[in-house]
């Protein structure tokens, strides 16, 4: 790829990261799967499955190599950038570590920690939580700094890109709960005194929505 322009190298790197993302979804769902790095030919129709460990190692390396040609924050909203690549490495390595792929949990957890530390050092949280969820707010520099990968919408609110995640009334096979958040998510929000629910005297197990961090009600729908 030595003869490619800088912009072309960026595009190739974005594609490599996206391919890694989709293979990550496959091995997370199915484990060992058929694995291609080039367009398959007709005689490869019944190709053997490749070990999920081999695929995971490959896609982690792909993302690491791709970071060389990506900006930390994409100039064009909705595009892959360096922080997304490292964030994906973190998520993929956590998968391998948590499920002890190939008996290499320690190695994968180390990779995950290193990738996460790079993103944490470069990206900051938005100053106003509400801005994350409104069009006007999403255009602000501090909000863009928090959003690692955006899903772009038209001004009328319709999605101009393919929806990456399921959104509906029921749980999906990829583990998304859609409009049904888990209790684990709800319990992560502190009380208004800044303490966790297992520490705060303000927490009421019978009325868990009371005295909670304002982001609790901004995130979760309640009756």
Each model region followed by its residue ranges:
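Conserved, well-structured interaction surfaces
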Residues: 1-30, 44-57, 61-77, 205
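Residue-level signal for well-ordered alpha-helical segments
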Residues: 3-4, 36-43, 193, 197
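Proline-centered turn/helix-capping motifs that create local helix->coil transitions or kinks
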Residues: 26-35, 124
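Residue-level signal for pocket-adjacent positions within structured domains
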Residues: 30, 42, 211, 215
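Short coil/linker segments at helix-helix boundaries
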Residues: 32-53, 99-111
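An aromatic- and glycine-enriched ligand-binding surface/loop that stacks and positions planar moieties
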Residues: 56, 64-65, 79, 83-223
